[in-house]
Amino acid sequence: MFLLFEYETFWIFLLISSLMPILAFLISRALAPISEGPEKLTSYESGIEAMGDAWIQFRIRYYMFALVFVVFDVETVFLYPWAMSFDILGISTFIEASIFVLILIVGSVHAWRRGALEWS
């Protein structure tokens, strides 16, 4: 028995949702006006001539801080449904959630020791 036929709606949705952005990019590339020149290579700064060097380096400290924030934000998303149904799920789910929180605490201690949480 081939069980993938039960998921034909999912495969059709996956195919359409994959082809739509590709089709949109191809249509925009085909219909976009082609204009090359030195004005296209300059950086846009609110309609005003760029003052100084517009290409600045992005500090990696901001990236690390944002990455740690996203990790803890995702942790909240995963723990919220568990907290809402805590009384129904039982002790095994409590142990699994405790292990999950313990892994995240170890990760946050590691990030703290590496200095990812310091803003200076």
UniProtKB/Swiss-Prot annotation:
Domain of life: Eukaryota
Primary location: plastid
One Pfam family from the record: Oxidored_q4
Places the protein is found: Plastid, Chloroplast thylakoid membrane
One GO CC annotation: NADH dehydrogenase complex
Protein topology in the membrane: Multi-pass membrane protein
SS bond list: none
Keyword Transmembrane in record: yes
Keywords: Chloroplast, Membrane, NAD, NADP, Plastid, Plastoquinone, Quinone, Thylakoid, Translocase, Transmembrane, Transmembrane helix, Transport
EC number: 7.1.1.-
Residues spanning the membrane: 7-27, 64-84, 88-108
Record field: catalytic activity: a plastoquinone + NADH + (n+1) H(+)(in) = a plastoquinol + NAD(+) + n H(+)(out); a plastoquinone + NADPH + (n+1) H(+)(in) = a plastoquinol + NADP(+) + n H(+)(out)
GO molecular function terms listed in the Swiss-Prot or TrEMBL record: NADH dehydrogenase (ubiquinone) activity; quinone binding
GO biological process: photosynthesis, light reaction
Stored InterPro entries: NAD(P)H_OxRDtase_bac/plastid, NADH_UbQ/plastoQ_OxRdtase_su3, NDAH_ubi_oxred_su3_sf
Assembly mode: NDH is composed of at least 16 different subunits, 5 of which are encoded in the nucleus.
HAMAP family per record: NDH1_NuoA
Free-text function comment from the UniProt entry: NDH shuttles electrons from NAD(P)H:plastoquinone, via FMN and iron-sulfur (Fe-S) centers, to quinones in the photosynthetic chain and possibly in a chloroplast respiratory chain. The immediate electron acceptor for the enzyme in this species is believed to be plastoquinone. Couples the redox reaction to proton translocation, and thus conserves the redox energy in a proton gradient.
Family stated for the protein in its record: Belongs to the complex I subunit 3 family.
Protein name: NAD(P)H-quinone oxidoreductase subunit 3, chloroplastic
Species in which this protein is naturally found: Cycas taitungensis
Gene name tied to this protein: ndhC
